[in-house]
C-alpha cells in the first residue's frame, strides 16, 4: 500500500519527471534488498504501465543497466539491491542528469554511519532521501539517529546532542520503570 502511495506521489509531484519544471527530479534511485527488486518493478508497471516512465531493475550483474541509467535520459528510475549499490556507486555518481532522489526500502539496514553501504550515499550527494522501514529501532537509539541523520543530515547537529536530548532521558526512564517493577 505504501509503495503505491509513494509511486503516486512521485508521479504527481514530478509531473512524469519533466526536466523543464522547477524542483522536479530527473532520476530516482531505489535501493532495496535483492529479493524486492522484482516487486518494485512490478509495482511500477502495475500502477504506471510500461511506457509512462523508464524503469530499469538490476536483477543480475547490472553493469549494463547501470550504464544505461547513468548515460541516458530514457530511464528515470533505477531499482537495485544494496549489494549492487556498493559496486556501482562510482558510476552512479556520474549520472547525467544527477540522481535527484534516493529511496531506501528496508532502510533499517543503514544502522551505522560507518558501514560501506551508508557511506555510498555520501558519494552520491543526493539531497532528497526517503527511508522506508517497518522496524526503525532494532537494537538501540543510535541506529535510529543514523536513519534520521540519513534522511535529514544535521537535524540533531551531532550524535552527542541527540544522545543528551533524547537517548539519555529515554534510557533513564526505562531504568526507573524497570526498578519499580522489580521492587
Predicted regions, residues:
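ASCE P-loop NTPase motor core, strongest for the SF2 helicase catalytic module
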Residues: 3-174, 181
Amino acid at each position: 500500500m505504501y509503495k503505491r502511495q509513494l509511486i503516486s506521489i512521485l508521479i504527481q509531484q514530478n509531473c512524469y519527471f519533466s526536466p523543464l519544471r522547477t524542483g522536479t527530479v530527473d532520476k530516482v534511485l531505489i535501493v532495496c534488498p535483492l529479493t524486492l527488486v522484482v516487486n518494485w518493478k512490478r509495482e511500477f508497471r502495475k500502477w504506471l504501465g510500461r511506457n509512462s516512465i523508464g524503469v530499469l531493475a538490476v536483477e543480475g550483474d547490472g553493469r549494463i543497466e547501470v550504464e544505461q541509467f547513468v548515460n541516458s535520459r530514457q530511464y528515470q528510475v533505477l531499482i537495485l539491491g544494496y549489494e549492487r549499490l556498493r559496486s556501482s556507486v562510482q558510476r552512479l555518481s556520474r549520472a547525467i542528469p544527477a540522481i535527484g532522489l534516493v529511496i531506501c526500502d528496508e532502510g533499517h539496514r543503514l544502522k551505522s554511519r560507518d558501514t560501506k553501504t551508508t557511506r555510498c550515499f555520501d558519494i552520491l550527494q543526493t539531497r532528497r532521501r526517503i527511508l522506508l522501514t517497518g522496524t526503525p529501532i532494532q537494537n538501540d537509539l543510535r541506529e535510529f539517529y543514523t536513519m534520521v541523520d540519513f534522511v535529514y543530515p544535521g537535524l540533531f547537529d551531532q550524535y552527542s546532542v541527540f544522545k543528551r536530548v533524547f537517548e539519555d532521558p529515554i534510557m533513564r526512564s526505562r531504568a526507573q520503570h524497570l526498578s519499580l517493577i522489580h521492587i
